[in-house]
């Protein structure tokens, strides 16, 4: 309809604390943030003074930016932002106090991150500084998990801003049926488990390029209003990092300011300022007078990292080092405090949950950022240890309310065989002990008790008689069986009498360059197990071309007499190869070298034999269990029949696959090794789904439907820094994990099964007197190769686009040219 308008808002995502740059006021740190934000503010004000009523929408991280960096290095920015709120109608919306991984938080961590962003004792809340803010959240990295709808509603949040984008910097474009333009440019209602909230589809500068230019985009939408195809106002919210080069004018010599999408915020406003149907607005201003148009549902966990998911923050070994420390602190807080937010580690833990301590940087973090993350995570653990109750006896603290208790312990004396362990305790029904180090210096203990108590006193020694182990190549539980071949491969796996795997059930390999290098089994032996269990040990070697150090691995499969699951301890020592590539651009200065020939790390790929409609089941960090269908990808976009990597599955203890007849679940011992989403998956064209716990896949980005025949999508994947493989971060590292393979029946998981799986995953706490032979295990189950600093100076930083072209020149000439031609042609037509 002609009387309808198109409302346009410009959003600036302010976070001066980066994973890909350091902490200095120059281009190696936050200097570019300050430069670009100042220019944005001055440009907006100049427009206002010349009668163009443009407004800015700011989602600014509080602790690092508003409280620390900007007051010290650029207080003028805060003053100008305040002035614009009062004088020109700029709007502040919520990002989160610590630019945190909101979706991977517990309820208390989440609520604190939102509440402190609004107001806090240090005076860095949005209300504290600006006097007001809109209760709209643009979550850092658009991280969202469905069950948090209830918390957002509880906190009075009006809406979420999530990307609906044409490039793999997106939240939900590829996981729902395609929205009409009327819906895509209006708030929509999202519903999960009967609770609803408003989501505002949000766009980036890449989407502007996809449309050719902003003027062409709004003109196209206007035609649909005039024809009656669209009968509502529309809202176009362009939101991008405030340090993005797209906001500032690019020097093109005599063509400066003449090519669309190269003139920064100045060009984006100038292009449309003369159109009578344009209203410059803000998200809060629009939803005040416009109700949601469409309805959407999805159960995937969203984030805007590599492969449109959680890869960038969860698949690096360093991610797991920091995340496992968070998990241990969370577990300890259940013993030290009556409520999580009262625990001694809580405040520092909230800060540690900043996404910056995990990614987006690829393949590794900036060397300074790793240092600060390690220091803060050390403090988080120390905060809890100092107040842990002193033990007069070895005590197991039950933090899950279950009969199953699981802990990792340090063994302080040299022992020859774990099978000689003796454990005594009142109401102890059974136990199993397996080594988590090949030298028996640590062990994983599983206890089954007859009665549910808050804590159990136990006695442990290694004076028992060592068990004689006889080799069996078949592990059987009441519901599972696993057969091993003579060379250590898995021959078959059955769950509830159904074969769900053959020789391809377990595969282990590295992709280096363009070749796949499989792990090489060298031995299969009986596993020495303490207590009532038995197992099989697989050992082998890992080799890569021109390796400086070879790799090795140990896979210990074992069963107990009190569970239907088959459990696994994995230790993988990755080979080390020479690191000679430095990623040092104006956008991403990592300060270190990598070997970019590493493409994929697949240490323990599980491919269950399932049929037809396969779903992912997952548990998040609010203890919510949900699932999504893997065929939702091709159903939403037929070009996504095959997806080389997807990670929409937070792993708060377990993740799995199932079809209409049942499936299999991988439960991970969170206090041994964990990350917010440790298990990427791969969808094959024949509907097969593969799981890659503690690994990372690489390949083609999934398809995002667009207006420009994919020219922008293809160019974006070549130059985006986070689009590189994460695999180089595994070079020379070592990781130990413990997880359980649980059968899932056709009827789903019973409450009893859920309780056992969660008890195994969440674990217990153990406290011991100093003179005992065992102690709580406090070391990391991961070692990383020392970073080799590149010594790059600020003057040596490269153009990020040119760096993206490196190694892809042929592709960039064709795809980049098509993208530029599309922009220029569209710009000419839109005049």
What are these regions (language model features)?
Residues 95, 137, 238, 349:
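Conserved, mostly hydrophobic/aromatic
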Residues 473-756, 763-764, 801-804, 809:
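Beta-strand/loop-rich accessory regions of lumenal/periplasmic or secreted enzymes
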Residues 398-404, 453, 457-507, 660-661, ...:
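Beta-strand-rich N-terminal accessory domains
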Residues 2-135, 142-199, 215-232, 266, ...:
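Catalytic alpha-helical scaffold of carbohydrate-active enzymes acting on polysaccharides/glycoconjugates
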Residues 2, 72, 315-420, 427-436, ...:
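Histidine-centered catalytic/metal-binding microenvironments
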Residues 436-455, 717-736, 808-817:
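A surface-exposed beta-strand-loop module
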Residues 60, 164, 171-179, 187, ...:
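C-terminal domain-boundary segment and adjacent tail
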Residues 243-254, 287-306, 346-368, 678-717, ...:
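Aromatic/acidic polysaccharide-binding cleft in carbohydrate-active enzymes
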